Amino acid sequence: MRCGLCVALLLAGSALAAEQPEETGAERDALSSVHVAIARQDCAAAVARLNEGLARRYTGIYLMAGLMYEDGICLKPNWERAERLYLRAHAAGHRAGVLRLVAGQARNSRDPAAALWWAQQSKGMALPLPCGVPEPVWSDPARFVDALQAWPAGQLEACVYAAGVTAMVTGDAEYPATALDFQLAGRVEMTFEPAKGASAWRTIQIESLPMTGGVSADTLRDRNSRRVQQSLENYLRDGGDRALRQFTRPAAVPADWRLTVVFAFSFK
């Protein structure tokens, strides 16, 4: 059984596939080799494997390279290069490219207008209603900026904060290794309250899929353990906490803003 990263985001009652081009085995191996090298603190190997993947135009490597430039992982921090790589991922059809552009532009208020403009481009991204701009407006950059400038004081900052946190959580979500190893599918709900700077998480459903090959009693016991059964929720919770630490919550965020996203993990 193979996973084609089936992480769907269920927003406002409608299903939205986390779109990305089909990932080949070679691309998965390339990404894994970069992760392994970083974990070993072998930056020379990480950069070498990264460059090999970029030469082969692997979409996932574009995202990985962008993250490494954005966060200064084995590379000198360079937002302009990160931005170009996220744009390449977006052009190749990977939805996370847009989400990382939203988060990156929102981070440290790098470019608030650009953050919200990209948020409008992301199909179905969860945003508070006051943060939305009609398509005829956001399709015209000048009108879009004028619309943002007409907002009440504090609304732009509040919207950028909500968009940035949500985009980082959803853009960074991958199928966690533990769930893959134990063939778990399921759905996890995030409720983000921007005014509190907090997210609540709950597991809606967990499904243990048939495991192929010889399966030991120890493996089955581990699979039913709390650690494994909650691996999807714990993985997403860690990502949510990490995103909240990256953004400074503005003083004036409406108390009634709530964003709900359901992450649906499945195999195909």
Regions of interest found by a model, annotated:
Residues 1-8:
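Sec-dependent signal peptide recognition
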Residues 8-18:
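Hydrophobic h-region of N-terminal signal peptides that target proteins for export
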Residues 36-44, 78-79:
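Helix-turn-helix repeat elements of alpha-solenoid scaffolds
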Residues 18-30, 44-48, 52-53, 80-268:
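Charge-biased low-complexity segments
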Residues 31-36, 62-71, 100-107:
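Hydrophobic face of amphipathic alpha-helices that form TPR/SEL1-like repeat modules
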Residues 39, 71, 75, 91, ...:
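Alpha-helix C-terminal capping/termination sites
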